[in-house]
Every structure is written in C-alpha cells, then in structure tokens.
UniProtKB/Swiss-Prot annotation:
GO terms for molecular function: microtubule binding. This is Centriole, cilia and spindle-associated protein. Residues 54-64 have a biased composition (Low complexity). GO terms for cellular component: axon; axoneme; centriole; centrosome; ciliary basal body; ciliary transition zone; cilium; mitotic spindle. It comes from Mus musculus (Mouse). Keywords: Acetylation, Cell cycle, Cell division, Cell projection, Cilium, Cytoplasm, Cytoskeleton, Developmental protein, Microtubule, Mitosis, Phosphoprotein, Repeat.
Amino acid sequence: MSPGSGVKSEYMKRYREPRWDEYAPCYRELLRYRLGRRLLEQAHAPWLWDAWGPDSPSDSSASPSPAPRGALGEPSAPSAREEEQPVGERGAELRDAEEQDTVLPAPPKKDTEEKPEEHKTKETDGAPSGPGPRQQPSALCARGSKKATRSPQRSTSKIKENKHPFALYGWGERQMDMGSQKTHNVCASASVHEIHESALRAKNRRQVEKRKLAAQRQRAHSVDVEKNQRVKPASAENPWLTEYMRCYSARA
C-alpha cells in the first residue's frame, strides 16, 4: 500500500501524523535528490561496449544487405576461375607482389658522392623561384601551433587522472589537491636549508611538545615521591582502609 493510494493500513489508521498531503512533495524531492546523486556518482566512468545491442554500428557494418544476383552476374565468372586456381599458386603470386613492393631501387653511391656541388647549386638557384621554400615557414608555424594545442590536452589529462572518481559533496577541488600532496619527512642528518619550511616548523613543534611532556612526567614523579615520604604508615587496625587505598593512597 503506497502512501498516495486511498487504502489505509493499520499503521496509517493508528498513526495519522504526519499527513501525507503535507509532506509528499518533500518526500518526492528527497527521492529525486537521492536518485540524481546516485546517477552522478555512478556516471564517472561509463563502460562503452564495442557491440552493444542488436542495432550497433559494428553489426550493420559486418553484415551488409545482400545484393541481387542479376546485378553481380557478370563478375561471377572471374571469381569462379580464381577459385579453380590452386592455393599454392596464389600464395606464390602474393609473395612475389609483396617483394616487388618492398624492394626499392637504391640510388647509386658514386653519383651521390661525385655531385654534391651540383645539388647545392640547384638548391640555391631554385630557392627564389620555386614555391617550396616559401611554404616552409608556414608549415613550421602550423607544426608549432599543433604542438601548442597538444600540450594543454596532456595537462588536462593529467589533471583528470589526479581527480577523485566520485563527485564528493561538500568538498572543493583545492581541499582535494591539498589532501593528495606529499608530506616532507625530516631526516636528522638533513641541513636546515634542505628542509621544507612547513616541515621544519612541524619538527620544532614536536621537539617542544616532547620537552613539555618530559618535564610534566618528571614533576609528577617528584610529587609522588614527596607524598610517599610524607604519608605516615597506616595502621592495620583501621577497618575502612582497603588494599587499594593502602597501595594507591599517594595519588589520591
């Protein structure tokens, strides 16, 4: 039985307050807030599947629509002939084609060694007339701009990696960054100039606290010794003196 329905349970009959009509909007608002918060927290890393659902692009690309046989009637003959050829001959042909593609004619070394001056003169002659050198500064500028645009992307990716995966409510980014920073440990052999200022202050503070604690313990010990010396031995006839009072009366 939902609160909005007209049917009332025994609990609703007995406890009439609070009224549903008054507090229904508040309840629904809180429900919506909880749902939105859950969605925010769970949407930090969505898992994208390659083949999700029957109508995915991978399925559509993998299985194209079958074409009619009449349209593909003419090229069917060469394909049948290719199938008749043995597999070994096809493999040999493919290997020969790959070798021909990979092997390129190397330039003769003698020509390159004998004519370095000719190349230099050609480059100097073609510099003012050819459009190639004029385009080089623009290409360099374009490369510089690409590098400049890539650098902020890398920095943003680093920032995203350092961020907490969940959206923490009530916490700012500065506090999160402060929490992820490393602390500076102080070695006894390190000089004052090599230590971070905050770590040096913390070290001095701890040393002062240790001295205070040592002084307090010494004072308490001396007070206990003085009390033990002053206290007179209690008589064993006192019925109200317990063993605890007899042993620990100096601290009371």
